[in-house]
């Protein structure tokens, strides 16, 4: 992908902003419902309704049960990790602060993505590991340290 494929880049950024908004909203609803897990359940239920609408409007076909059951074992991990992320964001986001939480999430995503790209896991096209990609991960670590530097008594608050 070209660095200048602006529509894709902007769409990805907007999706990331949506995730940034989703976590505190889910935390709010979880608090009102009495448990972060109720908040996660509420959020995932809404997600299910929305994605089913997309499927029925845009795809209009239903895969066979055989296709689903014959899929590799790891396809089930997507839903499991999705639920864990939503619940984890509700619990950890407010405690850590949303900026630190999501920077740690980005670090986790980029780190595992480098391995997925390098080894072609989950039938992804192999992409070589490079110095610039490793430096990118190190920069995310630097951002984590900068965001939480107040923990080390190095505050430079704008307030």
Place the predicted regions along the sequence by residue.
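Hydrophobic transmembrane alpha-helices of multi-pass small-molecule transport proteins
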Residues: 129-149
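Membrane-interface interhelical linkers
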Residues: 1-14, 28-31, 37, 45-74, ...
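Residue-level signature of transmembrane alpha-helical cores of multipass secondary-active transporters
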Residues: 11-13, 74-75, 102, 137, ...
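Structural motif at transmembrane-helix junctions in multi-pass transporters
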Residues: 35, 88-104
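Hydrophobic core positions of alpha-helical segments in small-molecule transporters
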Residues: 42, 104-105, 132-135
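C-terminal transmembrane-helix exit sites in multi-pass transporters
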Residues: 111-129
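Hydrophobic/aromatic residues within transmembrane alpha-helices
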Residues: 39, 92, 119-121
């Amino acid at each position: 992908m070209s660095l200048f494929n602006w529509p894709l880049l902007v769409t990805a950024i907007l999706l990331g902003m949506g995730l940034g908004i989703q976590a505190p909203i889910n935390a709010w609803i979880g608090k009102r419902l009495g448990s972060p897990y109720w908040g996660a359940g509420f959020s995932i239920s809404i997600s299910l309704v929305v994605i089913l609408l997309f499927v029925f409007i845009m795809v209009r076909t239903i895969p066979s049960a055989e296709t689903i059951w014959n899929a590799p074992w790891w396809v089930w991990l997507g839903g499991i990790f999705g639920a864990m992320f939503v619940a984890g964001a509700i619990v950890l986001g407010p405690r850590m602060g949303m900026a630190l939480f999501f920077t740690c999430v980005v670090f986790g995503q980029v780190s595992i993505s480098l391995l997925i790209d390098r080894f072609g896991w989950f039938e992804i096209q192999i992409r070589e590991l490079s110095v610039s990609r490793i430096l990118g991960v190190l920069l995310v670590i630097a951002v984590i340290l900068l965001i939480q530097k107040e923990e080390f008594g190095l505050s430079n608050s704008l307030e």
